[in-house]
Amino acid sequence: MDYKNLVAERIKENTELEVDLIEKLIEIPPKKEMGDYAFPCFQLAKTFRKAPNLIAEELKEKINKEGFEKVVTVGPYLNFFVDKTILIKDVLEKVLSEKEKYGSSKVGEGKNVVVEYSSPNIAKPFHIGHLFTTAIGNALYKILSFEGYNCIGINHLGDWGTQFGKLISAYRRWVDEEALEKDAIGELLRIYVKFHEEAEKDPELEKEARLNFKRLEDGSEEETELWNRFKDLSLKEFNKVYDMLGIKFDSLAGESFYSDKMDAVVQEIDDKGLLVDSNGAKVVMLDEYNMPPCMIKKSDGATIYATRDLAAAIYRKKTYDFHKCIYVVGTPQALHFKQVFTTLKLMGHDWADDCKHVGFGLVKLANKKLSTRNGDVVFLEDLLNQSVEETLKIINEKNPNLKNKEDVAKKLGIGAVVFTYLKNNRERDIVFDWKEILSFDGETGPYVEYSYARGKSILRKAGELTGEADYSKLSSKEEFELAKLLGGFNDAIMNAIDKLEPAMVTRYIIEVAKAFNKFYNAHGILNAEDNDVKLARVKLVEATCQVIKNALNLLGIDVVEEM
């Protein structure tokens, strides 16, 4: 039984509101003694022509209370107390029958969602800031797919632009081929930095770079061969990180993919009478939307990010006919995306309303203990490797005889980092602190993983238990609160989809782990007072482990069975 839906159905029987709307209005009371669900009656004031508190009293008398312990009013709220035995039985049976599918639905069936995320720049470091977009995008992809949406994950590589003309010049002058083979990104970064240093002394280098990029745009064989080499070397490095994170993309169509599609977009904008000359540049004026102009072409005729993003959006709509197109890009780009989406609307593409920018904050280091390859950029691969090493040290201290400890350290160490990126509101900055991230106490990945491993240990010791569980034996506050939380998994997922915020799932699973440990500390499980209680509690542990595993999988985190 879905109690939230039952509350909505009972209210619908006595009002003109639809179930979907009622479910959105239902709240969880701030204090447990106030009930399990609360319905605010403000929405009914116009229909009933009464004060909300009087409506609540009237509904309390009319409503069918079967399945509830009681229904009470608290001012303008109608509060429901569920029948605890029914709820526990329904939730645990549902979790244990649906297993890895528990929490999923078909709400997104038949709807395509494009998720653009990660998108590192070719020949540039894949640094710790990139994990924000990568982790958020991967989690949204998994969450949406879990709810039935057909997701298309796009890694919109930064593989085009005048910087490649500079890199070609730098390569021809200063590359160390041996260093390039050993550390491609490090060497490409070194020569790129050197180009900028030398260009300050010799402005002719900038002209040469522009000419190189012009040749690349025109399809010159020599420049194209170098560009492809830079791209292949970079992707080889990037894929090391994606393999560590277990991430695969459906498309690697980056900026270069749209290079032959931009002229048509510029022409379409011009045909609509939107293109305006501004000091030699071509722009779309957005004054009436309180935004600066959206630049389409620079004064030298070159296209910029906005042109490419317009071309990409139009291509994606034609190719995937998306229900939503999500851009997981840093918050500083918020204005850019507002300009792009508004320009699409002015071009007559009303589907621009289905394009959503998902912003995120910055990553800061709590201290400078993390070594860098060139003094200022922290490579993501180094960060993940260091996390695995630090985790292995902790395992060697706590449980040196653990089987497969290197594999456990890898899952725990990488999972701990990803969990940190997804723990709080995505627009908040992250302060990276090893001590906190790898702690087994508090709101961390290792704490949740430890809770799961603790549960699995109980299940291994319990062995195969026969007979049907009597869930009426789960009568304590801790047991009810844990079961009730498990029943709210789908709500957490739907909130994450509604807000495009994976932290809704992360925060939820932290609460589940806390509730599980409260239950574990308050009650004997394997040494319960009788076999009926033992069986019911073991089933509660099994359901908890299933929900934790499902939730961590949605976040792109592997579970560890033992630690």
UniProtKB/Swiss-Prot annotation:
GO MF entries: arginine-tRNA ligase activity; ATP binding
Family matches, as Gene3D superfamilies: Arginyl tRNA synthetase N-terminal domain, HUPs, Isoleucyl-tRNA Synthetase, Domain 1
GO cellular component, one term: cytoplasm
Motif 'HIGH' region, chain ranges: 120-130
InterPro entries in alphabetical order: aa-tRNA-synth_I_CS, Arg-tRNA-ligase, Arg-tRNA-synth_N, Arg-tRNA-synth_N_sf, ArgRS_core, DALR_anticod-bd, Rossmann-like_a/b/a_fold, tRNAsynth_Ia_anticodon-bd
UniProtKB keywords: Aminoacyl-tRNA synthetase, ATP-binding, Cytoplasm, Ligase, Nucleotide-binding, Protein biosynthesis
Protein name, per record: Arginine--tRNA ligase
Primary location class: cytoplasm
Family matches, as CDD domains: Anticodon_Ia_Arg, ArgRS_core
Domain of life, per lineage: Bacteria
Catalyzed chemical reaction(s): tRNA(Arg) + L-arginine + ATP = L-arginyl-tRNA(Arg) + AMP + diphosphate
Family to which this protein belongs: Belongs to the class-I aminoacyl-tRNA synthetase family.
